[in-house]
A protein has these predicted regions:
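Beta-hairpin "wing" of winged helix-turn-helix
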Residues: 57-76, 84
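Short capping segments at the starts of secondary-structure elements
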Residues: 10, 18-28
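Short, locally clustered residues in the helix-turn-helix/winged-helix DNA-binding domain
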Residues: 17-21, 34, 54
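Amphipathic alpha-helical dimerization/coiled-coil segments
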Residues: 88-122
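A detector for short, charged/polar N-terminal pre-domain segments
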Residues: 1-9
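Basic amphipathic alpha-helical segments that dock to polyanions
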Residues: 49-59
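Short, leucine-enriched amphipathic alpha-helices that occur as contiguous helical runs
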Residues: 8-12, 46
Length: 122
């Protein structure tokens, strides 16, 4: 059992949420996560975002499609990769979410104990 939740597990949790909310493609997810966590001193590495997305595809949670970024194919050549749930991906995502919740609760317990024992906070 790990001491704290793994970074990739943490990122996968957020990526699943973003796909549920249809919040864009890989690079957009990266930028959104950076903006969301920057105030907390955490900038998720690009490599970890794409590894996490790749794992979710390999695990059958997500599949990807490609499309042109703009609306005019005569001038828009940049292709983006969009992520979607597979047929049983939402169920797999929910199971994954429950597993990560258990780990998060354990980690929070450890952190709260350390905070209480060393700083007197409860």
């Amino acid at each position: 059992m790990a001491f704290m939740i793994a970074q990739r597990a943490f990122l996968k949790l957020y990526l699943i949420k973003m796909v549920e909310e249809r919040r864009g493609y890989g690079y957009q997810m990266l930028e959104d996560l950076k903006a969301e966590f920057k105030p907390h001193g955490y900038l998720p590495p690009q490599s970890e975002i794409y590894r996490a997305l790749h794992e979710l595809v390999q695990e059958g949670v997500l599949y990807r499609t490609k499309k042109l970024k703009g609306n005019d194919p005569s001038v828009d050549f940049q292709e983006i990769v969009l992520y979607h749930f597979t047929n049983d991906g939402k169920e797999k995502a929910e199971l994954y979410r429950k597993q990560v919740k258990t780990d998060l609760d354990r980690c929070l317990g450890i952190l709260h104990k350390a905070e209480h024992d060393n700083f007197g906070y409860s």
